[in-house]
Structure formats: structure tokens, C-alpha cells
Amino acid sequence: MEEKNMKKATIRDVAKAAGVSQSTVSRVLNNNGYVGEDARRRVEEAMEALHYSPSAIAVCLSKSRSRMIGVIVPQIFAPFFSRMYYIADRIMERYGYRLLLCNSDESLKREKELIDDLLSYKIAALLIVPVDGDEGSNKAYLDQIRSTGTPVVCVDREIEGIHCDGVYIDNYTACYEVTKDVLARGYRNIAYMADPPIYRPGCDRLRGFRDACKEFGVTVPQENIFLAPIEDTKPLNAFLHDVARRDVPPKAIINFVRGWDY
């Protein structure tokens, strides 16, 4: 009867079964360097007989670059970042890459630790939504990583003065144009919902909204402005229910809470 907890075969076991050195097995695994046809056949047969599969981490460490891309987001539960990861994963899969997803939890210290962990796996590139708040940012460190040859792409949050590549949204113009369009249609009693202005995207949206209102001479009461914590939908739902029960509810609601569809 086969044991339930069979010992996993190692590269040493394969080498012994094939009658070759461990370095020969390594060359077969990495397809690097000369290996005779007979030796290669024996190694492959030994791997099959022993059900040997190399550790993904060991393979990464044996190469100068892995086929893995590190991804760091600040709030893994936020729908916007989940969708971003999903799309990136589908695209990178076409090119033979796998993604390693990490959550910085909006912590500058944790973000740097995660970057170091990912670099230890010799990632091919880093895709990051950087922390950039009151604590500052890891701008200098990200630039340093880029200068050593690891591609770094910042997404969503643009850090001023950073030299890494980036994919950003013009949040100011988007919110300004949407608000301007609503006001141009004659709406004056309006409400605004968006992420809190803690990070640059939220700040830019709020600025765009206020500039459009100012241009049309419209003052929106504070009770009609809700800056939603995206990790909890309860306050946002409460705001919407409150708005709906008013004697004179807003005629239009401008929603820039990323990821939440109402």
C-alpha cells in the first residue's frame, strides 16, 4: 500500500536515480549548457519515475530574472484594485508571466518590506499603486530599483518627481468635465460622492468638482457631499438612503467612488 505522506523527491534523488551529477540535472531543468542525449533521457525518465517537480522558488533563485511580476496595491479589498489585478493577470498570462499580489495596507514601511520580499524572488518587474500620503512616499527607493534594471510601473497614484513609468488617470479633468456637463444641463441641486481626498486621485477629483461648481456659480451644501471610505459601504449606503428620504432630494448625484456601482 502506498504511503500517504511520501517524501518529495529532490534534485539529489533524481541525480542518483539517473546516475549523473546534480549539476547535470540542473542543466536539464534549466535547459542551459551541454547535456548528452543519453544523460538527458535518463534524467527525464528519473524525474518522471520519481514524480519530481522543481520548486518554483528554487527555479527563480537560480536565474537572474524570474517569470513573475510583483504587484503591490494599497487596499486589496477595493474593487478598483481587484479589477486592475484581474486585467493585468489576464494580459501577463499571454506572455508567460505570473503575478504575485501583495497588500501594503497604505503603510509606507510595509510597502518597502514587500518590495524587498518581491525583489528576493528576482521578479521580472514591479507593478505598484504606491503609498503617497502624509508619511511621504518610497519615491527614492523605487527610482533606485528602476536604475538597477528592474522595471517599475506606478499605477493610479502619480508621485511628483518620480522617474518610473506610470499609468495614470486625469482625475481632475474627468471630474471637472462630468460636473460641468451636469450643471450645463440645468441641474443645480446636486450631490457628490467620491473617495476621501487623502491621496492624489481623491484630491484631484474634489478639486475638479469644486472648480466646475465655481465656474457655474453653484454652491453645493456640505450635506450633499460625501467622501466615502471605500473599505466600508455602510456609510455610503446610509448617505444614499438619507438623500432619498429628503423632502427635496438632489436631482443629480455625481459618483466618483471607484469600484462601487450604484
What are these regions (language model features)?
Residues 104, 131, 156-159:
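Histidine-centered beta-alpha loop that forms part of the nucleotide-sugar donor binding/catalytic region
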Residues 1-67:
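N-terminal helix-turn-helix DNA-binding module of bacterial transcription factors
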Residues 109-116:
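Conserved ATP-dependent adenylate/AMP-binding module captured primarily in the ANL superfamily
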Residues 126:
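Intrinsically disordered, low-complexity polar regions and short flexible loop motifs
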Residues 1-4, 17, 49, 90-98, ...:
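Bacterial carbohydrate/catabolite-sensing allosteric modules
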Residues 54, 63-77, 95-97:
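Interdomain hinge and pocket-entrance segments immediately C-terminal to HTH DNA-binding domains
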Residues 73-90:
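N-terminal winged-helix
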